[in-house]
Amino acid sequence: MTQTHSSEKRRRLEPGRLVLASHNQGKLREIRELLSPFGLETVSAAELGLPEPVEDGNSFIANAEIKARFVAEKTGSVALADDSGLCVEALDEAPGIYSARWAGEPRDFDKAMEKVHQELTAKGAEASKRAHFVCALSLCWPDGHVENFEGHVWGNLIWPPRGDRGFGYDPMFVADGHQQSFAEIGAEAKKAISHRSEAFKQLLAACLR
């Protein structure tokens, strides 16, 4: 897969249609909010009726690139993919790239959070509750050029989960320096500190500003 290194000149994203390579409504909402100041015309892979490709990469970046390449090839437009997940220190960084799969089909993140809690409980009371979210972004052009970015946010897991303003594992994650979970702090506060926001800051600085 093509990797873009910091020493190479970044390709700018020109005005026009940008296809968001996602079927996850929570992600789509956050991505559109982050892109809203730039006047891009966005449409999702779900809205275009595109299937989801098999994500068989061994990293967040690899899976984001698989999705972005698939959509760029199918649509002939620039595509942006997000692959993200929760990495728990005491679980050897699981669920990691399998974060969505832990939620099963159809996606049930209450079940996924319960599984994380059960796995940690099995480790014993001394198990670390440290965890971090990762967000990998892959921006792919129809000619195959790719720009990749990755953001992180560190914190601790809580149980029981709290809040109903997020999605995924948000209700069980409290970022360092905060007392509320990602599902309690609200969209604007989350946007200021999240892994997705960090990855987007890199993308915007490199390809849009």
UniProtKB/Swiss-Prot annotation:
Q: What are the binding positions for Mg(2+) in this chain?
A: D83
Q: Which SUPFAM superfamilies match?
A: ITPase-like
Q: Name one GO molecular function term.
A: XTP diphosphatase activity
InterPro entries per the UniProt record, alphabetical: dITP/XTP_pyrophosphatase, ITPase-like_fam, RdgB/HAM1
Annotated active site: D83 (proton acceptor)
GO CC, sorted alphabetically, is:
cytosol
Carries keyword Iron-sulfur?
Answer: no
Binding annotation for substrate:
S22, H23, N24, Q25, G26, K27, S84, F167, G168, Y169, D170, K190, H195, R196
Q: So which cofactors does this thing need?
A: Mg(2+)
Q: What is its EC number?
A: 3.6.1.66
Q: Which reaction does it catalyse?
A: XTP + H2O = XMP + diphosphate + H(+); dITP + H2O = dIMP + diphosphate + H(+); ITP + H2O = IMP + diphosphate + H(+)
Cofactor remark from the record: Binds 1 Mg(2+) ion per subunit.
Q: Which UniProt keywords apply?
A: Hydrolase, Magnesium, Metal-binding, Nucleotide metabolism, Nucleotide-binding
Question: What Pfam families does the database record attribute to this sequence?
Answer: Ham1p_like
Does the record's keyword annotation contain Transmembrane? no
Give the EC class as a word.
hydrolase
Sorted alphabetically, the Gene Ontology BP terms of this entry are: nucleotide metabolic process; purine nucleoside triphosphate catabolic process
Q: Identify the PANTHER family for this entry.
A: INOSINE TRIPHOSPHATE PYROPHOSPHATASE (PTHR11067:SF9), INOSINE TRIPHOSPHATE PYROPHOSPHATASE/HAM1 PROTEIN (PTHR11067)
> NCBIfam families attached here?
RdgB/HAM1 family non-canonical purine NTP pyrophosphatase
Describe the subunit structure: Homodimer.
Role played: Pyrophosphatase that catalyzes the hydrolysis of nucleoside triphosphates to their monophosphate derivatives, with a high preference for the non-canonical purine nucleotides XTP (xanthosine triphosphate), dITP (deoxyinosine triphosphate) and ITP. Seems to function as a house-cleaning enzyme that removes non-canonical purine nucleotides from the nucleotide pool, thus preventing their incorporation into DNA/RNA and avoiding chromosomal lesions.
The similarity comment for this entry is: Belongs to the HAM1 NTPase family.
- Name the record gives this protein: dITP/XTP pyrophosphatase
Q: Which organism is it from?
A: Zymomonas mobilis subsp. mobilis (strain ATCC 31821 / ZM4 / CP4)
